[in-house]
Amino acid sequence: MTSAANKRSIMTLFLDKVDIYCHQVRIVLAEKGVAYATEIVDSESISEDLMELNPYGTIPTLVDRDLVLFNSRIIMEYLDERFPHPPLMPVYPVSRGKSRLLMLRIEQDWYPVLEKAEKGSESERAIALKQLKEEILAIAPVFSQSLYFMSEEFRLVDCYIAPLLWRMQQLGVVFTGTGSKAIKSYMERVFQRDSFLQSVGEMTPKNLMEDK
């Protein structure tokens, strides 16, 4: 593992451009203003380099000098500690615990449904997107209470929910009805952040507020 890591003089992220977990990490790297190299991974043919670094061959995998990390949450928390400004986790332990629980719930409750929408049949996609839309509309008041997701500052929790909402938009979901304005305002605010724009590359988010 060390020999493969030592070949790299700059922080390197092994990623798949469409993977949601890689997207999370790219947002954090952009928020922190970290210079890094990328290596695109072909899921059909994992490179020997990646297998040497990460025995699971999973992405994202981050190499920082002699350190190799995998699992997006581990990577993001490492980056937040390694580059403390701007902070992406709350200061107090209770708030940190609540944030970690929120991230876990988004990952366990919503990400699998999104995966069904992205990889399933047409009917499975419709059912999955309807479920996601209804569940997010059900918590719409949360989006109106603060600038970001349950916080006045952009946090790691936003790095979980923003890629989900982005993918829903790309799949044609439009929030309408009660609570939709707050959700769309949140999406507009997050999608226009420099870090998010960097994380999606050349894709430009459309103006969500056109669809009131």
Swiss-Prot record:
**Regions crossing the membrane:** none
Where does the record place the GST C-terminal domain? 92-212
A cellular component term, taken from the record's GO annotations = cytoplasm
SUPFAM superfamilies assigned: GST C-terminal domain-like, Thioredoxin-like
Q: Which domain of life is it from?
A: Bacteria
Alphabetical list of PROSITE patterns matching this protein: GST_CTER, GST_NTER
Q: Which InterPro entries match?
A: Glutathione-S-Trfase_C-like, Glutathione-S-Trfase_C_sf, Glutathione_S-Trfase, Glutathione_S-Trfase_N, GST_C, GST_Omega/HSP26, SspA_C, SspA_N
What is its biological role? Answer: Forms an equimolar complex with the RNA polymerase holoenzyme (RNAP) but not with the core enzyme.
Q: Which NCBIfam families match?
A: PRK09481.1
Entries under PANTHER family matching the protein: GLUTATHIONE S-TRANSFERASE OMEGA, PTHR43968
> What does the similarity note say?
Belongs to the GST superfamily. HSP26 family.
Official protein name in the record = Stringent starvation protein A homolog
What is the scientific name of the source organism?
A: Histophilus somni (Haemophilus somnus)
What gene is it encoded by? sspA
